[in-house]
């Protein structure tokens, strides 16, 4: 009995010493002042409501680019043989679309994206289209066609910027191409369709202006960000407002999920 009592005492002492070793000190030097804060200093805070981020400060032009909205095809209109899949390459964003031959020589398979209140583009500016894609059935290559479409031209859908991408791998890979529209259209549509007879999977579809604020790829809309910078705020709070708490604990703003490769955020 004495042996067990001694062992217990030794363990208790060891645990106490371990806890004591983890003690940290925080020293406040009350007589050493830091930078003086002016009572007239003003600042900004960013609350992600009313399209302040997507459709606002963030320069992405595609709505629901990873098919992860609660309604997975919100913002998209499909035509032909399009199916939604849920075993994609990105853990946090597993949904993607599969484009297959429509089975008719005069029909196409594809999808249109409406953007957020339309996809606004300017004549002569460059826009980077990118997509993760693969050939699920193997093969050497398949082609997809990318178009910016004016849906208001005399009741017809007129494509005013077009490019073709060749998907050449059965593994997921990022592809990109530059679109340069010849006209200015504040409410165009992005159209993507299969331009060959096989099957292609598409994930994380993006259309981004090349000319962003300070030239950052995947960056901020140049005019809005510069307008905020010109205010010269003393502080910038992010996240700001009540949206930080979400509607419940599961939907709270978790910054750890907003870093890393953009396709897996």
Question: How would you describe each model-predicted region?
Answer:
Residues 1-8:
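Bacterial N-terminal signal peptides that target proteins for export
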Residues 17-21:
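Sec/Tat signal peptide C-region and signal peptidase I cleavage site
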């Amino acid at each position: 009995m004495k042996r067990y009592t001694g062992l217990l005492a030794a363990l208790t002492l060891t645990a106490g010493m371990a806890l004591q070793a983890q003690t940290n000190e925080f020293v406040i030097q009350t007589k050493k002042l830091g930078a003086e804060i002016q009572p007239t200093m003003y600042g900004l805070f960013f609350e992600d409501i009313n399209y302040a981020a997507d459709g606002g400060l963030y320069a992405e032009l595609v709505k629901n680019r990873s098919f992860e909205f609660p309604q997975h095809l919100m913002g998209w209109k499909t035509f032909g043989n399009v199916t939604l899949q849920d075993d994609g390459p990105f853990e946090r964003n597993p949904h993607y679309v599969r484009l297959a031959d429509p089975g008719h020589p005069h029909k196409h398979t594809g999808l249109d994206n409406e953007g957020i209140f339309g996809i606004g583009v300017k004549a002569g500016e460059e826009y980077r289209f990118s997509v993760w894609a693969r050939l699920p059935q193997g093969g050497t290559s398949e082609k997809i066609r990318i178009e910016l479409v004016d849906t208001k031209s005399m009741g017809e859908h007129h494509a005013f910027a077009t490019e073709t991408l060749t998907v050449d791998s059965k593994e997921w890979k990022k592809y990109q191409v530059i679109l340069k529209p010849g006209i200015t259209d504040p409410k165009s549509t992005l159209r993507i369709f299969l331009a060959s007879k096989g099957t292609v999977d598409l994930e994380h579809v993006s259309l981004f202006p090349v000319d962003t604020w300070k030239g950052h790829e995947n960056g901020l809309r140049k005019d809005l960000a510069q307008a905020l910078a010109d205010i010269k705020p003393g502080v910038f709070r992010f996240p700001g407002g009540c949206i930080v708490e979400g509607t419940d604990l599961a939907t709270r703003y978790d910054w750890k999920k907003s870093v890393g490769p953009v396709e897996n955020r």
